[in-house]
Amino acid sequence: MAVVWMQQNFQQLIEQLKGTLGKLGARKLIALGLVGAALMGAILYTSIYLGRPSYETLYVGLSRDDVNRMGLALGEAGIPFDVKSDGSSILVPIGKAENARMYLAEKGLPTSNNAGYELFDNMGSLGLTSFMQEITRVRALEGEIARTIQAIRGVKAARVHIVLAEKGSFRRGDQKPSASVVIRAEGGFSAESAQSIRQLVAAAVPSLDASSVTVLDTNGHLLASAGEGANGAALMTASLEQQVASHVDDSIRKALAPYLGLGHFQTSVQAALDTDRRQTKETTYDPESRVERSVRVVRESGDSRNNRNDNATGVEQNIPQEQIQNRNGESSTEKTDRREELTNYEVNSMTVSTVSDGYSIKRLSIAVVIDQARLLQTAGTTPPPANFVDQQITKIRDLVATAAGLNTNRGDVINVTAVNFLDSAGADMEPVSAPWTDTLLRQSGSYANALAILAAVGLLIWFGLRPLLRDQNVKPAGTEVAIREAGEVATPNFIGGAESVGEGVQAVIGGPAAYADQMKTSLSDLRQRMRMPAKLRLEQMIEMDEERVAAVLKQWIHETASGREADPAKASAMPELKAA
């Protein structure tokens, strides 16, 4: 039923629209179409052209000297320009950027104080000493290195000073080159970038060691200095620890976010790393895989006898030339036999040399703070079960330990606490709002578009919808006046004068050809028109022929001013005509 009702209403709406458009006539339809086309064109124009900024960027990231020189050049060329509040960007009117760039390129702008090898372009070979050529070469090298450093993210400007080694005939030791770099850094600059700058300068200058390069910023902060080998390693270790802690913290947040939701927990991770370099050499032997390589057998045998005759001590030994008989003596016999066997084996061996130049995690310290109110909401019941918070904290601790890769054997520590978060946290850290004038200037294009669209809609309503609504609005029957019989109603003479109000009504009915044809073809149409309010009929009279109505009004006013007796019908029609 609802669908049928909607279809009927839609059909009625279409019929009413067709009827309304049919009553307007060709002239009004053409005028309405022209007004609509003009409004659409105005809306399209405002959306395309008014939304475009009046100025476009010519160059960004310029130094103050370049901005001043480019401003003078553009002023001489008669090109309007503007400079942003940061003082490093130049704007020109839309459509003049190409001409401005060509003109500035002809003038050699923008330029920089860091001149490179183009110094040799305008240098003549005559009249130059070796000292001047060497100075120019050093200047060119400094300028080229400074340009390369400025290409690093976070470096706004750079200046390089290089001291090359001077050769001397009466010097015992060679002088080593050195360099210093001064940079103007932005927010994205880090300590690792300072070390990178040192390596860059050392690689660009012959025989220059990275430890002889000093890097500092325009605020006077020393970023890297000569002889800080240990400090450089410490900085790298600290940076590496921050990266590891950040990676572990991200892993914990990814694990807790689906469970608790963002903003209901806070994590903190501290990592201690071991970055010592180790070299290990290990040799392993396999006794089961021995192979007999050589066998050596040595055999020795011996047989020895020893006889010893000793005379007995007595008087006979003191008698000269007396043969003494050996009565006592010792004899011994020795026989030896020795065998020696030596077998050599080949045993498989494996030697492993390990050089560890990376890092290992010595200890992790993790702290997790959870919003207790949010934790109680996950219970689903009020009040929550007993020991619910402790059980949830245990689960979260296990989850965090798994996500972070905790190892209790190396002394890792984890602490999970549930507390009530403050609702006003961060209330005192509200961002400072920009001045309303800046906001108004930035949104001026949008405001112009909005005003143009509102004006177009207002014109469409005034010239398009208002006439339609005026034709549709008919006063109630209480405002209608009785129309006399057609034979008794006189018609006004629009050319020569006016007889009565009845004459005017008959002129409205029979004047235009369209109304006359309709009267002849349909009596019901005539009755319907006769029932129309007098004001509406008079408005139609004015729309059909304004000149005749104006002539009638002039004649009536002239008659009234001359003091002639006015016709009662004319007198009753005067307020209606004035209102129309």
From Swiss-Prot:
Q: Where is the composition biased (Basic and acidic residues)?
A: 274-308
Predominantly, its location class is membrane
An example GO CC term for this entry is: bacterial-type flagellum basal body, MS ring
Locations of Polar residues compositional bias? Answer: 309-331
The keyword rRNA processing appears for this protein? no
Fetch the Pfam families from UniProt. Answer: YscJ_FliF (PF01514), YscJ_FliF_C (PF08345)
Localisation per UniProt entry: Cell inner membrane; Bacterial flagellum basal body
Q: Please give the residue ranges the record annotates as the region Disordered.
A: 273-339
Q: Where are the transmembrane segments?
A: 29-49, 445-465
Please give the record's induction comment: Transiently expressed during the early exponential phase.
Coiled coil residues, start to end: none
Give yes or no: UniProt keyword Translocase: no
- Gene Ontology molecular functions: cytoskeletal motor activity
- Topological relation to the membrane, as annotated: Multi-pass membrane protein
Keywords on record: Bacterial flagellum, Cell inner membrane, Cell membrane, Membrane, Transmembrane, Transmembrane helix
What are the GO BP annotations of this UniProt entry? Answer: bacterial-type flagellum-dependent cell motility
Superkingdom of source: Bacteria
Q: Gene3D superfamilies per the record?
A: 3.30.300.30
Q: Report, from the record, the phenotype seen after gene disruption.
A: A fliF mutant is attenuated in a murine model of infection. As the infection progresses, the number of cfu per spleen from mice infected with the mutant is significantly lower than the number from mice infected with the wild-type.
Please give the subunit comment from the record. Answer: The basal body constitutes a major portion of the flagellar organelle and consists of five rings (E,L,P,S, and M) mounted on a central rod. The M ring is integral to the inner membrane of the cell and may be connected to the flagellar rod via the S ring. The S (supramembrane ring) lies just distal to the M ring. The L and P rings lie in the outer membrane and the periplasmic space, respectively.
- Record function comment: The M ring may be actively involved in energy transduction. The flagellum is required to cause a persistent disease in a murine model of infection.
Q: Report the family membership.
A: Belongs to the FliF family.
- More info: Induced at 24 and 48 hours post infection in HeLa cells.
Q: What is this protein called?
A: Flagellar M-ring protein
